[in-house]
Amino acid sequence: MKKITEQLQEIISEYSEKLGQISETDFSIKPLPEKWSRKEELGHLIDSAHNNLRRFMVAQYETNPKIVYEQNRWVHMAGYQNQSSEELVVLWKGLNLQVVEVLKSMPEKNFSRPCNTGKTEIELHTLEWLAEDYVRHLKHHLHHILELEAIPY
């Protein structure tokens, strides 16, 4: 888990600076009415942080908790498109710093505890796998937001 928290700290430091360089106008552009703007995509990462924080904590004391969310609904209901990009970057950074703290304080014996992330069927994943996946997912979306080389997910 140490490697994961180190990667996450590097991502927070490097990418929060890059996100801060995107203009409000560029952050707000929707490529198509049904597609997310950069603000909404960053909002999706905020929602992901919320849900994964819950997974990382609840699965340490409950057996196979089911923690899922409807990403498009969350993005729409949160109203990210109407918020300033600066506020969204601050929120994204703060939540990810909290993810780092939760993962750092997690006892090693809990790395293998499962969490159910399946919406219709049971999909059990260990907390360690979820942490690794969280970093992959984060980098995939950050590269898309920043128009960097695509990272498959």
Region annotations inferred by a language model:
Residues 7-11, 18, 75-113:
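Acidic/histidine-rich alpha-helical segments that form the ligand environment
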Residues 21, 44, 59, 102-105:
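Conserved catalytic core of Hanks-type protein kinase domains
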Residues 21-26, 104-112, 149-153:
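Surface-exposed helix-capping loop/turn segments at secondary-structure junctions
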Residues 3-6, 17-21, 62-65, 77-81, ...:
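Short acidic/polar alpha-helix capping motifs at helix-coil junctions
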Residues 1-9, 35-42, 85-89, 128-131:
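Amphipathic, non-membrane alpha-helical segments in soluble helical-bundle scaffolds
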Residues 1-24, 47-58, 132-136:
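Alpha-helical bundle segments that constitute or directly flank the non-heme di-iron/ferroxidase center
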Residues 28-72, 114-153:
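Short, contiguous alpha-helical
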Residues 25-30, 86-88:
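Short helix-to-loop capping/linker segments positioned immediately adjacent to catalytic or ligand/cofactor-binding
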